Regions:
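Non-catalytic interaction-recognition regions
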Residues: 1-93, 110-588
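Short, charged, solvent-exposed linker or helix-capping segments at domain edges/interfaces
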Residues: 94-99
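Short, charged beta->alpha transition segments
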Residues: 101-110
């Protein structure tokens, strides 16, 4: 189904052509004076020079050709040459009816699906998720859902930090605590135990303890580095411990991400890239892409057009060890080989931008990634507390993500049960659902690249630009529709009215923008545009609701038109919150 702006542009283009002007001047935009009209065209001013005519004369010629158009109820040429366009009420109602009959709400899905890999999440195993992991997870999840909504094939990859020094630290500390375990017996020949020698809570305590010791004790640090080396070179006992770490940690991560309604298609990590590194390094050296600089192997990525220095991409340290850049390039080798992506999107902290500029340039320069494959950096800003500094616990420590979620749910529970009687189980379930909306909407309503303040009081409010307000609007619509059906009336096959009031018209005009908005959110990887849209849509509905006696309307045809409008509003809102990664309860 075409966007409403496409219908308008086609009508305008035909009018420009019929008036003797180039149809390419028929560019349509939303009006910057919505009190006068809904859309406008400034093409007459753009064409004035080419046709040696006053813009107002061109505008008048075009307006004359639009007489009798089914799209518009009023078209005016306004000095110095604007064409103001007011949409015909029947045209808008018919467009909405067509949206309602389409399971995709008229979404203009791509007819050329791309294979897209999204790299997001990126936690380290054996460490608890903290608030710093929130943004990558929920922004990446939303971008994935938006791309799928637009018809693309998408794989979400968590890209675990599961290889390297932290593993050596855990192995070293475990050996100190439990030296009798068979993993540390070089003469052990049997099967290693199937059960891990630690729980997730023990594992999460082992790592910081080991890390602290290594900073204070050089000999301990050397042992941890040696354990890392042995693991990476296939030590059987250490590999068995690593498998236990992965099993225990990944199961816990899956539980925590499920609580965030975040789901990954691929649970690969840095360890999966290791097998690709030797051949990749060999090729880079053999084909002259990499050279030795101060003992390290590097790829030059500076370009003539650069206005500042871009350091070389280092792929091997002087001692032969790999770096993050090595792993990221090897991961791209694996992704190209296994998935043949048209696009790879990295949802990471914006402070890592230089690193990814280096990696992307190295990948393209060396042919690791085909020239036609797009590599996209989606950098996000910091989630701050009310003091403007990175969000912390009241004691000043790093807050665990599960504790933040619990705090928000507790706040929602208080607000849901305040001055009203609600069954305990229902109140808890509703608090969980609405709390998730508070967190996700609070984050996603900000442009990804911007820092923002995580304000628990504001985000959990049922008023203003918040997730709970959006859900309250959906629940209000559900309640009206339920009452309508309780009267024994069907909610299928209903048609939207030609608008009879300003608030009804405003709601209808908000709904017709859905298609274009979703397309734009995909093109710009911008979940915040969906948030802005549904806030406007919710406001338009609530204004209509307060001005209109929907169920008390005596004219049955008119009432049915209202109900049709409500059904479509609910579907559009639910479609949008689905791609944002949360849902609405039945009651609030």
């Amino acid at each position: 189904m075409k966007r409403i702006s496409d219908f308008i542009a086609e009508e305008l283009a035909a009018a420009f052509e019929a008036a003797g002007y180039d149809r390419n001047y028929a560019k349509v935009t939303l009006s910057n004076r919505p009190d006068l009209c809904e859309y406008q065209c400034n093409g007459a001013m753009a064409g004035a020079k080419a046709y040696h005519k006053a813009p107002i004369m061109i505008a008048q010629d075009v307006v004359a050709k639009l007489e009798g158009s089914g799209c518009f109820c009023d078209v005016q040429a306004v000095n110095p040459g604007f064409i103001n366009l007011k949409l015909d009420e029947r045209f808008v109602a018919d467009y909405l009816d067509e949206m309602e009959t389409d399971e995709d709400l008229g979404l203009n899905k791509t007819d050329k699906p791309k294979m897209i890999v999204i790299d997001y999440g990126g936690p380290n195993v054996a460490k608890p998720l903290h608030v710093g992991h929130l943004r990558s997870a929920i922004i990446g999840e939303s971008v994935k859902r938006i791309a799928r909504k637009m018809g693309h094939n998408v794989l979400g990859d968590i890209h675990l930090g599961d290889w390297g020094y932290q593993m050596g630290l855990i192995i070293t500390e475990l050996k100190e605590r439990k030296p009798e375990l068979p993993y540390f017996d070089e003469n052990f020949k049997g099967e290693y135990p199937a059960e891990a020698p630690f729980t997730i809570s023990e594992l999460e305590e082992i790592y910081p303890t080991a890390s602290g010791k290594a900073k204070e004790d050089e000999e301990y640090r050397e042992r941890a580095l040696h354990a890392t080396y042995l693991l990476q070179n296939g030590h059987k006992g250490y590999t068995a411990i690593w498998n236990h770490i992965m099993h225990v940690s990944v199961n816990d991560l899956k539980k925590n991400y499920a609580n965030l309604n975040v789901d990954f298609d691929l649970w690969k990590g840095e360890s999966d890239a290791q097998a690709y590194i030797p051949d990749m390094i060999e090729r880079l050296k053999k084909e002259g892409f990499a050279h030795v600089d101060d003992g390290a192997l590097v790829i030059d990525v500076q370009e003539e057009s650069d206005t500042k220095e871009i350091p070389p991409c280092m792929v091997q340290k002087s001692d032969g060890a790999s770096l993050y850049g090595t792993t990221d390039l090897a991961t791209l080798v694996q992704r190209v080989e296994d998935y043949h992506p048209d696009k790879v999107i990295y949802v990471v902290d914006k402070r890592q931008e230089l690193h990814f500029v280096q990696v992307f340039r190295a990948a393209k320069k060396t042919g690791i990634v085909p020239s036609e494959t797009e590599l996209k950096f989606l950098g996000f800003g910091t989630m701050n507390g009310k003091d403007g500094k990175p969000f912390k616990t009241r004691e000043g420590g790093v807050m665990r993500l599960e504790n933040l979620i619990a705090e928000i749910q507790e706040e929602m529970y208080k607000k849901i049960t305040d001055n009203r009687t609600v069954e305990e189980e229902e109140a808890k379930n509703t608090a969980k659902t609405v709390g998730m909306a508070a967190i996700k909407y609070g984050d996603l309503s900000n442009q990804a690249s911007k820092d923002y303040v995580f304000d628990v009081d504001r985000f959990t409010s049922f008023e203003g630009n918040t997730g709970p307000y959006i859900l309250y609007t959906i629940v209000r619509i559900k309640s009206i529709l339920n009452k309508y059906q309780e009267e024994g009336k069907a909610v299928t096959g209903l048609k939207v009215n030609q608008q009879s009031g300003e608030s009804e018209k405003a709601l209808m005009l908000a709904l017709v923008k859905y298609n274009e908005m979703m397309e734009n959110a995909y093109e710009e990887l911008a979940p915040h545009k969906i948030c802005a849209y549904i806030y406007d849509l919710a406001n338009a509905f609530n204004h209509f609701y307060h001005e209109t006696k929907i169920l008390a309307e005596e004219n049955e045809a008119k009432k049915q038109g209202y109900i049709a409008l409500l059904i479509l509003t609910k579907r559009v809102l639910e479609s949008c919150i689905d791609v944002l990664g949360f849902e609405a309860p039945e009651r609030m």
